[in-house]
UniProtKB/Swiss-Prot annotation:
It comes from Salinispora arenicola (strain CNS-205). It is found in: Cytoplasm. GO terms for molecular function: N-acetyl-gamma-glutamyl-phosphate reductase activity; NAD binding; NADP+ binding. Its EC number is 1.2.1.38. InterPro entries: AGPR_AS, AGPR_type-1, NAD(P)-bd_dom_sf, NAGSA_dehydrogenase, Semialdehyde_DH_NAD-bd. Gene3D superfamilies: Dihydrodipicolinate Reductase, domain 2, NAD(P)-binding Rossmann-like Domain. Disulfide bonds: none annotated. It catalyses: N-acetyl-L-glutamate 5-semialdehyde + phosphate + NADP(+) = N-acetyl-L-glutamyl 5-phosphate + NADPH + H(+). This is N-acetyl-gamma-glutamyl-phosphate reductase. Pfam families: Semialdhyde_dh, Semialdhyde_dhC_1.
């Protein structure tokens, strides 16, 4: 018998990707998948790609999770904390929502609203010392999708003194799956196709998470909705230190990271190369004319930005190689 796994919030995009990864994992046994409005439906009627998984979606209730050794929470922001508080302390929990990412209650109230639920171990294992903290934890907060792409691009450069922590500017495009599966008029194909649209300009909720993890002191972030189902491409710029080689700094930082790839000089990340994988692709240079350091980061928002990273964290928590059940290679075209 494998490690018994429950997925809460299984009807959404991240939940569906979690189910796909768990079902193919050699050490995980999917015992429960729960949902709200879709409870009572057979799993394959909600996620047609999962035909062959003979499960009925259960109501989201702590009692339905009693037999699980490991629980993934793929719920909307603000809904994970109350449920997590009712789970046994020995149950390992990975929260894909934002409820437990931030240390600062003021930042939580300012960007999300409501009561701060407290911080869990932050699940970006490539940060210094973080893999060991995740391994020792029973509660892990999975990073946000944009936050993952930007932190992986920026954190080593600030830590090494290669980039100044002030005056960081980011523009990042994301596929529409990042907005969730709920029906919304502005996400209809007729609205999205052939269009690029910025949103939450200067006020995106991942800003405090990025600053917390990187040490950036000022960050201007413009997210852009792109006409594609999934993927994130982030362009991060900062003031460089004199004579810095940002590609070398990143290559050294991620030399032992199986899911972070610093591309050869002259090649730049693009979203299609990461789709279906748990990898983040990075490239960096210095714009001498503008005096700016530029890093481009690409990943699959549902993979490395959500479900894949959650499985990576779970692997570390239960003592498995972090690569177990995950692919470092994308599917293209």
């Amino acid at each position: 018998m494998g490690i018994r796994v429950a997925v809460v919030g299984a009807s959404g995009y991240a939940g569906g990707e979690l189910l796909r990864l768990v079902a193919g994992h050699p050490e995980f046994e999917l015992v429960t998948a729960t949902a709200h409005s879709q409870a009572g439906h057979r799993l394959h009627t909600v996620h047609p790609q999962l035909i062959g998984l003979d499960l009925v979606l259960a109501e989201t209730d702590p009692a339905a999770l009693a037999d699980a050794d490991l629980v993934f929470l793929a719920l909307p922001h603000g809904e994970s904390a109350a449920l997590a508080a009712q789970l046994p302390p020995k149950t390992r929990v990975v929260d894909l929502g934002a409820d437990h990412r931030l240390a600062d209650p003021y930042a939580w109230a300012n960007y999300y609203g409501g009561t701060h639920a407290g911080q869990w171990t932050y699940g970006l294992s490539e940060l210094p010392g973080q893999r060991e903290r995740v391994a020792a934890a029973t509660r892990v907060a999975n990073p946000g999708c944009y936050a993952t792409a930007i932190i992986l691009a920026l954190a080593p450069l600030i830590a090494a003194g290669a980039a100044q922590p002030a005056d960081v500017v980011v523009v990042a495009a994301s596929g529409v799956s990042g907005a969730g599966r709920a029906a919304k008029a502005h996400l209809l194909a007729g609205e999205v196709m052939g269009d690029l649209s910025p949103y939450r300009v200067g006020a995106h909720q991942h800003v405090p998470e990025i600053k917390q993890a990187t040490g950036a002191t000022s960050l201007s972030f413009t997210p852009v909705l792109a006409p594609m189902p999934r993927g994130i491409l982030a362009t991060v710029t900062a003031v460089p230190a004199r004579g810095v080689d940002p590609q070398a700094v990143l290559a050294e930082a991620y030399a032992d990271a199986p899911f972070v790839h610093v591309l050869p000089e002259g090649r730049w990340p693009h979203t299609a190369a990461t789709l279906g994988s748990n990898s983040c692709h990075l490239q960096a240079t210095v714009d001498v004319d503008a005096g700016r350091l530029i890093v481009v980061s690409g990943l699959d928002n549902l993979g490395r930005g959500a479900a894949g990273q959650a499985v990576q964290n779970a692997n570390i928590m239960v003592g498995l190689p972090e690569t177990t059940g995950l692919s470092a290679w994308g599917v293209t075209p």
